[in-house]
A protein has these predicted regions:
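Polysaccharide-binding and catalytic clefts of secreted carbohydrate-active enzymes
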Residues: 4-177, 181-200
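Hydrophobic targeting/anchoring helices
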Residues: 15-19, 156-278
Length: 278
């Protein structure tokens, strides 16, 4: 898709378009990307909507990050026009007279960039608000494509701790259940602090819809991406799982069931390891 539609690749804040690769490398604003996602989601819904094993739809995976491409710039300007109505109101709200950063039109506004303006607090805050709204708009299109195909099961998407790139409380309004991925860095000297922080994260997830949530991902042994990742002590996995349930989780799920043969997360912990053991 990236070869046929280069616009689907994200542009970094320094205005460099990313090469194909890694993940989370797609523009939520791109019409081409949205259309292909709609087609895939509808096909999935048409195929599995009546399957007795499908009780919930997991929308995308760990929405995150942002794109600064021309499509997103124009969408951001339209978002600002809708909020402020005229450029004078924007200048007043952002106090752009400081350092003579006054805008003459919305067309002059660019998202925060290390090679441009990144010191205006109002600009940074509104950009973050826009990123959340644009992500929600994309997510809702994903949900609508399922509904249009006749899928009636509830939907969720997995959050990541107190991730600061998106307003999870706003996103939670558009899904039926909140779910999240919990990967505490256990086995440190400050073990009680890790337990306190994990408890707070569970409470945050429950508070978003004022009802039980789902623990979508947890690791039965040790993740592969933490700086120091020790194996869990005997009984710790059970304690962490019970902690989630005690704070309102209706599930304890693992990533991954079987360790991958290759790729970035081949050494990520799993229920079944490379040797077939558990």
């Amino acid at each position: 898709m990236a070869e046929t539609y280069p616009e689907v690749l994200r542009v970094r804040e320094d205005r460099t378009r990313q090469l194909y690769g890694e993940r989370h490398n797609h523009c939520y604003t791109s019409p081409a990307y949205r259309e292909r996602v709609r087609i895939i989601n509808q096909k999935l819904a048409e195929t599995f909507k009546n399957h007795p094993g499908v009780i919930l739809w997991h929308i995308s995976n760990e929405y995150r990050d942002e794109c600064h491409c021309p499509l997103c710039q124009e969408a951001f300007r339209n978002w600002l026009r809708n909020k402020y109505k005229d450029i004078g109101s924007l200048n007043q709200a952002w106090w752009t007279t400081f350092w003579s950063h006054t805008y003459n039109s919305f067309n002059q506004v660019e998202s925060p960039s290390s090679i441009g303006d990144h010191g205006l607090h109002g600009l940074n805050l509104d950009w973050k608000r826009f990123v959340t709204d644009q992500t929600i708009d994309f997510m809702c299109e994903e949900i609508h494509s399922l509904r249009d195909a006749g899928a009636t099961q509830p939907v969720t998407t997995n959050f990541m701790n107190d991730y600061k790139g998106l307003n999870y409380y706003n996103m939670a309004k558009h899904i039926d259940y909140v779910s999240w991925d919990s990967y505490p860095a256990w086995n440190k000297e400050e073990e009680i602090c890790t337990a306190y922080d994990t408890a707070m994260q569970h409470d945050l997830m429950r508070s978003m819809k004022q009802k039980p949530f789902l623990l979508m991902e947890s690791c039965p042994s040790s993740p592969n991406w933490q700086t120091v990742s020790k194996l869990k002590k005997p009984g710790l996995l059970q304690s962490a799982s019970l902690q989630a349930i005690a704070h309102g989780s209706d599930s304890v799920q693992y990533f991954q069931i079987r360790q991958s043969r290759g790729g970035f997360e081949k050494f990520h912990g799993a229920v079944i390891d490379h040797y077939g053991g558990s």
